[in-house]
Design a protein with these regions (language model features):
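Catalytic active-site module of serine/aspartate enzymes centered on a nucleophile-bearing elbow/loop
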Residues: 297-332
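The serine-hydrolase catalytic nucleophile loop
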Residues: 74-86, 278-280
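Conserved alpha/beta-hydrolase
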Residues: 77, 85-109
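Short beta-strand/loop motif that positions the catalytic acidic residue
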Residues: 261, 267-269, 273
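Short beta-strand element of the alpha/beta-hydrolase
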Residues: 63-71
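Catalytic nucleophile-loop/oxyanion-hole region of alpha/beta-hydrolase
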Residues: 101-139
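Alpha/beta-hydrolase-fold enzymes
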Residues: 3, 131-239
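N-terminal cap/lid segment of alpha/beta-hydrolase-fold proteins
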Residues: 20-61, 305-311
């Protein structure tokens, strides 16, 4: 993987009129208009007989397929999915967003939901696609929570992941969940981000009570939660076999398995990401030779806006697609 060090990837130049990690996070996600994408929806049955929604974009036959794993409470409508697939379409490449359970307006049938270390979900999805499209070059990209889940799968699979995908990318992934959770539960972050996340997460937790005669969660307690730590301790951890929030955050974090990644992987994190303290980001000593670190000083959390007002979200998809294109000719 020596040639990874010589990648000629675009340099990120932030919009000078949008300073700061919060503005660079919120504006692209909530205020910037993008032309909507047209998806084709499929419903898949999971190995444990649950259901998820899967959205496809068009592309030319025989071209690569990009599998996108979205972030916390995200979907195929998230700004990062729209910007990536617009540019992929120009290349003729196809895209797919397999929604995590309870996302994409598909209520799931089981108490199980999704979590930041859900590598088992990533595994069956990617292997199903590989089986159904054995001659199609597969690439995987994960954003935020989906990025951590993808990285965890890559680390756990090691070299065998090369039999499934050509290359991967993770954007603004919370590889240290404790550092991320603690950052989101403090100060202005708690009001800007955590409160929004908990608004939909509480509703989904209430729905879970209807799926089990012996629920894992106490709705009266869940109604009172004000932090991600409390929610993960009361809901996420017990629903998915973890012994509380500390166990969940520790075991689900991908940072500890980054040295085991064998698939060419691009790791993009802004140093001013409000979700991830810069000191918690991995260094070259923390990753394998297959991992290419890209850590711009600015960009926010899954933001990376550039250009004059109103700005554009071109740098991130251009960088990811160039990385994927670079690894397309590699012989298996």
């Amino acid at each position: 993987m020596a040639r990874e060090k010589h990648l000629d990837l675009p340099i990120y130049r932030p919009s000078s009129w949008l300073p700061g990690g919060h503005a660079q996070t919120i504006y692209p996600a909530a205020l910037l208009w993008q032309r909507p994408l047209t998806y084709k929806r499929e419903h898949w049955i999971t190995p444990d007989l649950d259901a998820i929604g899967v959205d496809w974009t068009d592309g030319r036959a025989g071209t690569p397929l990009i599998v996108l794993f979205h972030g916390l409470e995200g979907s195929s409508r998230s700004h990062y999915a729209v910007s990536l697939f617009h540019q992929a379409y120009r290349r003729g490449w196809r895209g797919i967003v397999p929604h995590f359970r309870t996302c994409g307006n598909v209520p799931n049938r089981l108490p199980r939901s999704y979590h930041a270390g859900d590598s088992a979900e990533v595994d069956w999805i990617l292997r199903r696609l590989k089986k159904n499209f054995p001659e199609t070059p597969l690439f995987a990209v994960g954003y935020s929570l989906g990025g951590n889940a993808l990285l965890k799968w890559l680390g756990e699979q090691g070299d065998t992941a090369n039999d499934v995908i050509y290359a991967a990318a993770a954007v603004s992934a919370p590889m240290d969940l404790a550092a991320c959770g603690n950052a989101l539960d403090k100060g202005i972050n708690r009001h800007l981000y955590t409160r929004e996340f908990l608004g939909t997460m509480r509703k989904k937790a209430q729905y879970k009570l209807k799926l089990s005669e012996n629920p894992f969660i106490d709705w009266q307690q869940v109604k009172q939660v004000r932090t991600l730590r409390e929610f993960d301790d009361l809901v996420t951890a017990p629903l998915h076999g973890f012994f509380g929030v500390e166990d969940y955050w520790s075991r689900a974090s991908s940072k500890s398995v980054l040295k085991q990644i064998a698939v060419p992987t691009l790791l993009i994190n802004a140093l001013n990401d409000p979700f991830m303290p810069a000191h918690s980001l991995p260094t070259v000593q923390d990753v394998s030779e297959a991992v290419h670190l890209l850590q711009p000083r600015e960009g926010g959390h899954v933001g990376f806006l550039s250009g004059p007002p109103p700005g554009r979200l071109s740098w991130l998809p251009e960088t990811i697609l160039k990385f994927f294109q670079y690894h397309l000719p590699l012989v298996r």
